[in-house]
């Protein structure tokens, strides 16, 4: 799994993260919960190399640089508009997937599983907010990564599509991936989380030391 040790991250003089150790095992869904400002989204960005922090992050015992974590990780962001690049919904699912892995029916099955078959030929930016959310989650299922981060993945989803999202998240964990979910949604927690990590805001600025 993923092991975080001695992790510290600051915005200016304000320390946002101070984590002596955190274990994120393969094969289980770890939920990060806590109030706004607790550093949940910042931690996920550090985990996949989008932010640099002090400390060590290991995958299966091997220390990883930020660039390696970016290559091995996939993030479903809260702002899904920044993750849509294809000209059609169907094309979006195939982006970044090696041609040999695009077996017959795989894209169509994934579209159907996420209630997107009827909009397969539309431009992703023409979809509703909930449809865009489902598309980005479906795309996560298509790529083969080791670390999956879902930041508020149930935003804009009705109950039926929340259940299909929870199923996708569980499928990834059952494929022995590291899966982390940031959520305030109790229904999603109940549907997919194996472990819950409670995060709290740190008080005040970091101590300043002068040698």
Where are these regions (language model features)?
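The feature captures the beta-strand-to-loop junction immediately N-terminal to the Walker
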Residues: 33-35
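Helix-to-loop junction immediately C-terminal to a conserved catalytic motif
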Residues: 48
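Conserved ABC transporter NBD signature motif
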Residues: 52-71
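Conserved ABC ATPase "signature" region
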Residues: 102-119
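Conserved ABC ATPase signature
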Residues: 123-127, 131
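ABC ATPase C-loop
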Residues: 140-141
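Catalytic Walker B motif of ABC-type/P-loop ATPase nucleotide-binding domains
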Residues: 148-151
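H-loop/switch region of ABC-family ATPase nucleotide-binding domains
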Residues: 183-184
